[in-house]
């Protein structure tokens, strides 16, 4: 997503450069070597020659803020008021810790900048305790004239008070703030005493040792385990001092981290930031302390603080923080939607702030840092879609890349998470196999059905798990293949050909085609399959799913029409049509669809714990089938058409075929001309398998998933197509990689790091890249062939409800469908997406208009006698996208309208759906 232009950035910089900053010019830098040598009552090490602290640019920077308060016994102490770790975290009045985005006032940032400009900056102080730091700090404040010598002991005793951490009984919300008073009896005037009447004066007593509250004992170790070993902390101390005339700030950077145990987390302290000042109505120390802690928690400023050699560099880092900040004008915000425009502006500012200083800028935007070494060439050489220009070169590279890791594929499977994934993927693969098997039997009149599809899925999944280069792929039947089977079956019926024998010859040509494509490294053509083509394909399949569901329902109503009156003579035999069948079929189909859709949406709701919701949502389809089949089972007096499943390893239609299909024909000789014409339908099948398999491999191989064993575009395609070609010889369906099931499989095997750090996104620890989960799923699906006593009770209307569910839900992740909906929305309700904000509205409608025209053309071909040619028309969308659309849209518009911006989701939050990542039909 592109950010705002340069004008916006310049305006932001000018607004953050007020005249009040001019007093920073000519200010001195105070170094640790300028400490007063009279400090002799503490253990200080020799400072030596000062060198900049080693660069520790860790992502985590822990900051803890302590305020001076009076505890329940009216004793002064330092109380933890908040902590910063990515986000600001503070204890709410109810006693619970809550994290939120730190929001700062503009005035507090100005005051902080002035304080840094005039305050004390001590760099690389050689002190091994916070007490030593306090002595050095006070001596420097007196040396620079910011603290009177008679106040030294008062401030020192305050800095050495014990530190406590909040609990339900004691926190900054329940305890009064304390104020430093001078011990020599100096008093304020009457107005100041009236102003401070609610604050108790601190009775100066030096308390050694750090207090430890229950919250520290419980939370500290838990949070510490989530942080890297090299994390260092910043301690911010804020107190109100009545004897000071103006605020003072002192920043101390230690030469070596101090291990004093005053923090809630056992971390060494590298920075100590102290803010002291008089209580004044024009100064809000609450906001200043939050601003100071937020700045110290900033990743870039922390790097500058580690590396700075003086005050000027530190102020430069603070200036960079201000330039990247956003200021809201003091006016009422009409609605929260208007605040959404801040998100891209803030992201752009953060991206520029985190940008590597060596990055080369060009008119087209930032480019990668210059690197002529070998490290930059390694990823390119390992690109699985890089041409080797040798016959079968890509296949050889896939084998050399993956097969040496075969033993690790077995070892990595010895994990409980893999067993859980097996159970989950089994049901995820079984439900569509039963659904498509029942529908395939309907479309082909029993030539292939549930038993053939289950056996084909089992055998091919087993072989693929053993031999593939990417065993995370789940092989199965899909909607596009079902559409082709129906079209080819009608073609064979119209021309008097044996459908099951024609598939054998298609299988032979499939094997030759895939060998030719793999030999020529044709799989690299997947680079040209943009979102434009994928969404046309997905939208067409979704429409076919929805249309076929209602077409089947209409057929049921025609076979069993409703009657306006019924014969009450019970002695007569009932007629063949059964009017209740149509109504019950409608109820079963609609009930299955809405129940499955509800369970999918329930997965992203806020009810029940997240694990329970995801479990229910992931098993939504089998739950829906079970519930509606159970309802049909208890309705005894109404007939519904059931799923036809043979017993054991029998074929669906034993009278028409066997397990081996003779290539020359069984009932009649197969025409020779059709043997040589079979390359045409074979090419169509190959296009469908190629599209689904290669796009699925691309999705699962995204860098965000952090797979380390590589993928195999060439080897996996060869295995899937070759196994499908051989399966046709036994009268079984050919299969392809299934997108939704593959993503589900990969997510189930992904170990996502659980972090207690507020604001930190879930990160991948590892992915269990192994072969046994797919192998066990294949075995379980094969055993499911023996489930005939259970499967025979499933009504076909229930399967058509699942068919409708797949068609409707496939539209949710298609941006083409979203753009069609934009035509019905007023512009003010349009989403803040790049293709909406960067492209004019009338041009947004032009892109889906061309896609709709192509879909209409494909639909016309589908319903015509030339329905087999649909994949050919689909392939023509590739040159259409690359040759015609650039003449209609500009380059930036095409990038917005035709980019793969699907976010990889490993753990869904409320309102998110992992299947929106998928742009292919399932």
Curated annotation (Swiss-Prot):
Membrane-crossing residue ranges in chain numbering: 417-440, 449-469, 473-489, 499-519, 532-554, 582-602, 614-634, 675-695, 712-730, 731-748, 772-792, 793-811
Descriptive protein name: Band 3 anion transport protein
Side Extracellular, residues: 441-448, 490-498, 555-581, 635-674
BP-aspect Gene Ontology terms: bicarbonate transport; regulation of intracellular pH; transmembrane transport
Intramembrane residue numbers: 850-880
Taxonomy of the source species: Eukaryota, Metazoa, Chordata, Craniata, Vertebrata
Function noted in UniProt: Functions both as a transporter that mediates electroneutral anion exchange across the cell membrane and as a structural protein. Major integral membrane glycoprotein of the erythrocyte membrane; required for normal flexibility and stability of the erythrocyte membrane and for normal erythrocyte shape via the interactions of its cytoplasmic domain with cytoskeletal proteins, glycolytic enzymes, and hemoglobin. Functions as a transporter that mediates the 1:1 exchange of inorganic anions across the erythrocyte membrane.
SUBUNIT field: A dimer in solution, it spans the membrane asymmetrically and appears to be tetrameric.
Ranges where the record places region Disordered: 1-36, 355-389
Recorded catalytic activity of this chain's protein: hydrogencarbonate(in) + chloride(out) = hydrogencarbonate(out) + chloride(in)
Record keyword Ribosomal protein present: no
């Amino acid at each position: 997503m592109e950010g705002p232009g340069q004008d916006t950035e310049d305006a932001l910089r000018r607004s953050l450069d007020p005249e009040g900053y001019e007093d920073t010019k000519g200010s001195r830098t105070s170094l640790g070597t300028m400490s007063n040598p009279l400090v002799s009552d503490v253990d200080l090490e020799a400072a030596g020659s000062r060198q900049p602290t080693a660069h520790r640019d860790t992502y985590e920077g822990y900051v803890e803020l302590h305020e001076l308060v009076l505890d329940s016994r009216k004793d002064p102490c330092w109380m933890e008021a908040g902590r910063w770790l990515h986000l600001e975290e503070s204890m709410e009045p109810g006693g619970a810790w809550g994290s939120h985005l730190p929001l700062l006032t503009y005035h507090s940032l100005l005051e902080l900048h002035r304080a840094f400009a005039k305050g004390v900056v001590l760099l690389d102080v050689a002190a091994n305790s916070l007490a030593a730091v306090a002595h050095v700090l006070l001596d420097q404040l007196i040396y620079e004239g910011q603290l009177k010598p008679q106040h030294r002991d008062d401030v020192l005793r305050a800095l050495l008070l014990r530190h406590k951490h909040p609990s339900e009984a004691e926190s900054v919300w329940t305890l009064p703030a304390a104020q430093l008073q001078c011990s020599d009896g100096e008093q304020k005037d009457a107005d100041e005493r009236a102003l401070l009447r609610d604050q108790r004066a601190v009775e100066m007593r030096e308390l050694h040792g750090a207090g430890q509250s229950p919250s520290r004992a419980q939370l500290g170790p838990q949070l510490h385990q989530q942080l890297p070993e090299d994390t260092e902390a910043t301690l911010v101390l804020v107190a109100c001092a009545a004897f000071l005339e103006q605020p003072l700030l002192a920043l101390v950077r230690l030469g070596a981290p101090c291990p004093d145990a005053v923090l809630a987390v056992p971390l060494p302290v590298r920075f100590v930031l102290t803010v002291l000042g008089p209580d004044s109505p024009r100064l809000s120390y609450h906001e200043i302390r939050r601003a100071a802690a937020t700045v110290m928690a900033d990743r870039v400023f922390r790097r500058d603080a580690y590396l700075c050699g003086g005050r000027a560099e530190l102020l430069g880092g603070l200036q960079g923080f201000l330039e990247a900040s956003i200021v809201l004008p003091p006016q009422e915000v009409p609605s929260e939607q208007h605040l959404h425009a801040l998100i891209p502006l803030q992201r752009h500012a953060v991206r520029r702030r985190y940008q590597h200083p060596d990055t080369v800028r060009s008119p087209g935007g930032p480019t990668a840092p210059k690197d002529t070494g070998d490290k930059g060439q390694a990823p390119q050489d390992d690109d699985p879609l890089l041409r080797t220009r040798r016959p079968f070169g890509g296949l050889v590279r896939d084998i050399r890349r993956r097969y040496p890791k075969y033993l690790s594929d077995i070892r990595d499977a010895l994990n409980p998470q893999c067993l859980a994934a097996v159970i989950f993927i089994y049901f995820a693969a079984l439900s569509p196999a039963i659904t498509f098997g029942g529908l395939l039997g309907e479309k082909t009149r029993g030539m292939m059905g549930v038993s053939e599809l289950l056996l084909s899925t089992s055998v091919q999944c087993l072989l693929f798990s053993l031999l593939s280069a990417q065993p995370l792929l789940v092989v199965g039947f899909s909607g596009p293949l079902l559409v082709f089977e129906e079209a080819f079956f009608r073609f064979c019926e119209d021309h008097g050909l044996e459908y099951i024998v024609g598939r054998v010859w298609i299988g032979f040509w499939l094997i030759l085609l895939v060998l030719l494509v793999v030999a020529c490294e044709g799989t690299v053509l997947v680079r040209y399959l943009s979102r434009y083509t994928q969404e046309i394909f997905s939208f067409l399949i979704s429409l076919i799913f929805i249309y076929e569901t209602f077409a089947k329902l209409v057929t049921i109503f025609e076979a069993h029409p409703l009657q306006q009156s019924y014969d009450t003579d019970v002695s007569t035999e009932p007629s063949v049509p059964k009017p209740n069948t149509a109504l019950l079929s409608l109820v079963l189909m609609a009930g299955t669809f809405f129940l499955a859709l509800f369970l999918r949406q329930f997965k992203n709701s806020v009810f029940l714990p997240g694990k329970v919701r995801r479990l229910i949502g992931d098993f939504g389809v089998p739950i829906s089938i079970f519930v509606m089949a159970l309802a049909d089972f208890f309705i005894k007096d109404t007939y519904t058409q059931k799923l036809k499943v043979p017993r054991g390893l029998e074929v669906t239609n034993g009278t028409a075929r066997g397990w081996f299909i003779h290539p020359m024909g069984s009932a009649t000789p197969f025409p020779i001309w059709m043997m040589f014409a079979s390359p045409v339908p074979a090419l169509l099948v190959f296009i469908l398998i190629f599209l689904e398999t290669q796009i699925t491999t691309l999705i699962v191989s995204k860098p965000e998933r952090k797979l380390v064993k590589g993928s195999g575009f060439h080897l996996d395609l060869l295995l899937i197509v070759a196994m499908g070609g051989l399966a046709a010889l036994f009268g079984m369906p050919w299969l392809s990689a299934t997108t939704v099931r593959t993503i589900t499989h990969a997510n189930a095997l992904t170990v996502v790091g659980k972090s207690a750090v507020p604001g930190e996104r879930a990160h991948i620890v590892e992915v269990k890249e192994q072969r046994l989960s797919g192998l066990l799923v294949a075995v379980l699906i094969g055993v499911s062939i023996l489930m005939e006593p259970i499967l025979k009770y499933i009504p076909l209307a229930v399967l058509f409800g699942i068919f409708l569910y797949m068609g409707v839900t496939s539209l949710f992740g298609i941006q083409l469908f979203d753009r069609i909906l934009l035509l019905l929305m007023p512009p003010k309700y349009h989403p803040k997406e790049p293709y909406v904000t960067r492209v004019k509205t009338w041009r947004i409608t032009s892109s889906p208009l061309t896609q709709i025209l192509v879909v209409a053309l494909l639909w016309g071909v589908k319903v015509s006698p030339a329905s087999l040619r649909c994949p050919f028309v689909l392939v023509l969308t590739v040159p259409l996208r690359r040759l015609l659309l650039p003449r209609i849209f500009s380059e930036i518009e095409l990038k917005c309208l035709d980019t793969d911006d699907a976010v990889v989701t490993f753990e869904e939050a409320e309102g998110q759906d992992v299947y929106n990542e998928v742009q292919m039909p399932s």
